[in-house]
Amino acid sequence: MVLFTLEDFAVFKATTLATRMHLIREQLDPKFAEAATVIVPLLQTDQQAIYSHIAKHQRRYRNPPPNTWVAFSTSSRGYKMVPHLALGFWDDRLFLWLSVLRESKPASRVLTGITAMATTLPGKWQVAGEHTDKAMLPLTSANLATVGARFQTIKKAEFLLGKVYLADDPIWADPVRLWQDIQQRVVALKPMFDQLVQNV
């Protein structure tokens, strides 16, 4: 069973590239790999294979990565060019984002049907417009419209919808419950993931 814990955030206390990369490879990547064995079957269908991509950080030469993740997409070659699901860490949060990055453009109709589906999601969710920034907004009809409109009109804007688990969230006291919640949210996001894939 995959158990993400508060101890995982200690990876980001390492201040050098070599040390942080070593900790990511030793501590987080094995958990991402194990998580993938559960999440891939939740997303794939008989008609559509899903592939996992653990961040490699190959372009890092000096500064340590501020975050790390595993992404799930319909492409075996990568994930940035297509809608995907990303599960990962910053130094103060775990995130699960359904993402359409700028590399997926131009795809003017990519968000078709997503707004109506998103507003029916149970529980608390977040939206954001930039995957390299921690900034996020609670999922409301107004915030969803704002992020969606920005995505459609600004070249570098992105679209992210999902769940962020801040390090001070009480759910971290029960790693089993956290992992169950992640799986439930993957299932909840799957219809939108499928719609985005169809739209592109």
Swiss-Prot record:
UniProt protein name: UPF0637 protein LCABL_14170
Organism lineage string: Bacteria, Bacillati, Bacillota, Bacilli, Lactobacillales
Entry similarity comment: Belongs to the UPF0637 family.
SUPFAM superfamilies tied to this protein: YktB/PF0168-like
InterPro entries, sorted: UPF0637, UPF0637_domain_sf
Bilayer-spanning residue ranges: none
